[in-house]
């Protein structure tokens, strides 16, 4: 396999401008913005070739990709001065799927990867906003449950709606930090039940 992971950050990009076939649309656009000097957070794109290999190889991720991904996360940690899994200053990342052509609403995303029962406390302390931190963690569980584990979003949404009914509120933003704690526990139970 040739080069499979392409880095981008505010120092530029390792990829070619018109490389949607290799990077997908989002990856190519991020690379182009980085090359133009626009402020983009540090990140990397895993080549579309890896997806092709994944499906040809009985849904196995090559060890080389796992090693390179860990290396790229280390680069992001160095640039951001955050560390994946750190209890004081955790690195949070988003994982976004992409294709050669735009497919709005069809591609999956997982936000807040890096949050867990411990790192959510660091996010709360960093932002001074427990409700935001817990809601972010709840979203991670929901997205991961749906995208990776195949649990229908409906089940998560139903838990939220039922919880709001018991609290007598209409909007998600009316829920307090303790409410999100309760929903996080409910979401974890749902994941256990469905997997």
What residue ranges belong to the model's regions?
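Nucleotide/phosphate-binding sheet-loop regions of phosphoryl- and nucleotidyl-transfer enzymes
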Residues: 1-195
């Amino acid at each position: 396999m040739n080069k499979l992971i392409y880095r981008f950050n505010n120092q530029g990009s390792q990829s070619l401008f018109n490389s949607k076939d290799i990077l997908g649309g989002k990856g190519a656009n991020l690379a182009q913005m980085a090359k133009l000097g626009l402020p983009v957070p540090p990140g990397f794109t895993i080549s579309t070739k890896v997806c092709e290999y994944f499906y040809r190889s009985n849904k196995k991720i090559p060890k080389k990709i796992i090693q390179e991904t860990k290396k790229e996360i280390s680069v992001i940690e160095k640039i951001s001065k955050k560390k994946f899994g750190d209890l004081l200053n955790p690195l949070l990342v988003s994982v976004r799927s992409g294709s050669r052509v735009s497919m709005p609403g069809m591609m999956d995303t997982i936000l807040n990867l890096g949050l867990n029962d411990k790192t959510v406390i660091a996010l709360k302390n960093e932002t001074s906003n427990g409700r935001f931190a817990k809601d972010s963690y709840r979203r991670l569980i929901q997205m991961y449950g749906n995208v990776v584990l195949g649990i229908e979003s409906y089940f998560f949404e139903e838990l939220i709606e039922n919880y709001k009914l018991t609290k007598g509120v209409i909007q998600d933003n009316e829920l307090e930090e303790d409410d999100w704690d309760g929903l996080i526990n409910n979401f974890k139970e749902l994941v256990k039940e469905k997997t």
